Amino acid sequence: MDNRPIGLLDSGVGGFTVVKKVIEKLPHESTVFIGDSANMPYGDKSREQIIELTRRSVKFLLQKKVKLIIFACNTATAVAMPTLQNEVEQQIIGVIQSGSLAAARTTKNKKVAVAATPVTINSHAYQKEIKFRDPDIKVMEVAAPELAPLIESQKDYDTNLAAVKRSIAPLKDQDFDTFVLGCTHYPLIQNEFVEALGDKIQIVDPADQVAQYTFNVMRRDGLFSSFDQAGKHEYYTTGDPDKFSEMGRRFLGQADLTSHQVDTRNL
């Protein structure tokens, strides 16, 4: 048994999509989530910048004495996870491996499309992971640099829908049956993706598989909490705590959710 909290990090509010699934799967566990909204988007930054920014969030979570860390950010998973896993004792769980497994299991015609930030796409992390599971699957990748910042700014449905349609335009006439939301921000506007793609396309949200994998790791390593009541949840951001809290309340349905602003630059 281990009563320490689970740590989660993201470049911004997208991590709430993973927090939600983790809370649903592990209701007795406590969590600490930090979103680095002051420095988002990560998707247009250099490898060195992404590693350093992610390292700051990891250090913050370690100060909170977490028992494992979930990189609830595809860009951080693709770029920083290999380096930072060697720097900490706690296991780090990424979203790309889980999302790739779900995509490989879902596709029937062995054609999968992935939308993500430019850095994630340029790393070809999803392509490598999906093909590792099934070399016969064709993976089509599209960079969507405008979506994560747009979601952070909390625009209306029509604005989001237009942006989604622009972003997936390069996939027109491609015969894929499965679409991966390759950025944890994207499930926040999943309805817009459903309308833009049509109801025949299966949409994969890696957060579902991340929560299941986290459960499996904790069972294997004896990390479950001994508490039988609902866990406690803390939320932090390097950006605007009011905007961060608003998105959290809306997506998690926690009417009393509050977040705290932190400065991770001097950790």
Curated annotation (Swiss-Prot):
UniProt GO MF annotations: glutamate racemase activity
Q: Name one GO biological process term.
A: regulation of cell shape
Question: Main EC class of this protein?
Answer: isomerase
Q: Which residues form the active site?
A: C73 (proton donor/acceptor), C183 (proton donor/acceptor)
Q: Which Pfam family, an example, fits this chain?
A: Asp_Glu_race
What chemistry does it catalyse, as a reaction equation? L-glutamate = D-glutamate
Pathway(s) the chain acts in: Cell wall biogenesis; peptidoglycan biosynthesis
- EC identifiers of the protein: 5.1.1.3
Q: Which UniProt keywords apply?
A: Cell shape, Cell wall biogenesis/degradation, Isomerase, Peptidoglycan synthesis
The entry's substrate-binding residues are: D10, S11, Y42, G43, N74, T75, T184, H185
Q: Which PANTHER family match?
A: GLUTAMATE RACEMASE
Job description of the protein:
Provides the (R)-glutamate required for cell wall biosynthesis.
Task: Provide the family line.
Answer: Belongs to the aspartate/glutamate racemases family.
- Tell me what this protein is called: Glutamate racemase
Native source species = Lactobacillus helveticus (strain DPC 4571)
Q: Which gene encodes it?
A: murI
